[in-house]
Amino acid sequence: MIFNQLFDEKSHTYTYIISSGKGREALIIDPVIEKTNEYLNILKNLELKLVKVIDTHIHADHVTGLNELNKQTNCTRVMGETSPSEVIDIKVKDNEKIKIEDIELTTIH
């Protein structure tokens, strides 16, 4: 399993890159737009394909990299069902499962 925690000092935001490593699929949680190239380089170096990007909430502390990552990788954009954003591909409910390969995350609102 691959679990990378990255910290953006400017916005004090933690971002996570997660993959089982088996089929080389990955997801990113709470990306910061200024770090998009860094995330893409990590994915490339680890030979991972970004399939999902998740924002856990609307970010007042930074501009999300969700849409930029979608533009560059065609990954699926995920947020909670109460998000007012109209550029989300999947809106998840409380206690819903988000899966990539054999990794399963449970949403909490």
Q: Each PLM stretch: what is its role?
A:
Residues 12, 33-109:
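Active-site HxH/HxHxD metal-binding segment of metal-dependent hydrolases
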Residues 1-49:
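Conserved beta-strand hairpin/beta-sheet module of binuclear metal-dependent hydrolase folds
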